[in-house]
């Protein structure tokens, strides 16, 4: 076979490998749903009855295989990897402190689809506090895909339904959030950057932006994770609560219109959508801006 034909065959094979859809599988084991991509462990959705709220951990990078997020880190034991919660909800705390202050309880975590090019997980959760009427029910849906060998996506849709009139006082502890692994934090040489190219806590804190990304070097690899806000979200683009030590969250409840509280009536529904991009390379190399345009 000629050298040209060998090169042509290699290019065709490479293209086939790159275009081939990853096989994504999920299995429910006790209070976890474990997800693998092409046989490699990616993440678990954890909904144990002794946790404050359901969350994803680990969230393994596509290159290193290690989690890009961390659990119960140092001074902030309430940071559980990739999670959704809120403080100051009708006097309850569905973010930190003891379980008696408030919990988000999974009552129906299920695998809706698995085994092909995506996994779909659904859950129904009740926000519960002893001695108080439950203020919120939420329905959540997660779609996990892998468009390339270096990118994993978790598309998140959470519908909050107010079971009674709800008042959320101004709080920096609100809604969808992530705590990165220490080696990817700015304090340890990583980079935090938003859609406008601003970097670091000082430049990004309180700034409204469609997306935010953390990335850093781990061994021979650079890996990271971005959170994208969908344009249909209320308050889009929400200002971000960012910390150089590795925390980031689009946090509308910290910047309410009257600088005091957010009020919602019984029966009101709040639909929130996010895309989590777990990627090799930095934000530019992973083309996070292009992934946001596709997400819109």
What are these regions (language model features)?
Residues 37-40, 110-119, 146-150, 217-222, ...:
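A short, structured loop/turn motif at beta-sheet edges
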Residues 165, 172-237:
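Active-site/ligand-binding surface loops and adjacent short beta/alpha elements
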């Amino acid at each position: 076979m000629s050298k040209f034909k060998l090169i042509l065959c290699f290019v065709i094979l490479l293209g086939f490998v790159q275009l081939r859809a990853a096989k994504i599988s999920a299995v429910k084991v006790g209070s976890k749903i474990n997800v693998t991509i092409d046989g490699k462990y990616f993440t678990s959705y954890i909904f144990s009855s002794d946790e404050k709220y359901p969350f994803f951990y680990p969230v393994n990078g596509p290159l290193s295989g290690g989690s890009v997020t961390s659990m119960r880190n140092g001074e902030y034991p309430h940071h559980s990897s990739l999670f959704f919660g809120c403080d100051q909800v009708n006097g309850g705390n569905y973010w930190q402190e003891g379980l008696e202050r408030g919990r988000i309880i999974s009552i129906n975590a299920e695998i809706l689809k698995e085994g092909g090019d995506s996994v779909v997980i659904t859950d129904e959760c009740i926000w519960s506090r002893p001695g108080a009427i439950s203020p919120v029910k939420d329905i959540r849906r997660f779609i996990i895909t892998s468009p390339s060998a270096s990118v994993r996506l978790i598309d998140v849709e959470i519908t909050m339904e107010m079971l009674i009139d709800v008042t959320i006082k101004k709080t920096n502890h609100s809604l969808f959030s992530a705590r990165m692994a220490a080696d990817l934090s700015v304090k340890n040489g990583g980079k935090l950057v938003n859609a406008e190219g601003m970097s670091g806590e000082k430049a990004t804190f309180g700034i409204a932006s469609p997306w935010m990304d953390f990335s850093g070097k781990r061994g021979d690899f650079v890996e990271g994770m971005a959170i994208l806000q969908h344009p249909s979200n209320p308050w889009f683009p929400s200002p971000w609560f960012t910390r150089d030590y590795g925390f980031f969250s689009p946090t509308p409840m910290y910047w309410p219109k009257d600088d005091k509280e957010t009020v919602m009536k019984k029966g009101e529904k709040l639909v929130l959508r996010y895309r989590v991009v777990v990627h090799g390379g930095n934000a530019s190399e992973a083309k996070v801006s292009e992934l946001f345009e596709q997400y819109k």
